[in-house]
Amino acid sequence: MRFMMIGKANQQSEAGVPPDPRLMEAVGKLGEEAVRAGTMVASGGLAPSAMGTRIRIGGGPMKVIDGPFAEAKELVGGFAIFELPSKEAAIEAGRRFMALHTEIMGPDFESELEIRQIFGPENFHR
């Protein structure tokens, strides 16, 4: 089963402030471990929404809207795609990732990770 882990943006990432180097090193090591284990398919951080564009349809002509976009907590800051046997395994991988943030940034650091299964053609057959 494939899962996408979606890291929410925060005010610092939206301002283009790079993450703490200690956190990046720890996350890099965790990612390398997952790649070696064959569980991480892809990962990446996203540029601030000020560099992004949305294309919206409905209620009239198509609209192209340049960022920045409001509500940083609703924006995606990064992602990882994993191949794992179950949702429980995905939750455990997500917990390990988030635990690094608490260990390095401290207990007051706030962040959110959303885990969603990626559907393939087999999920749409009736």
Region annotations inferred by a language model:
Residues 1-126:
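Conserved, structured core segments of small domains
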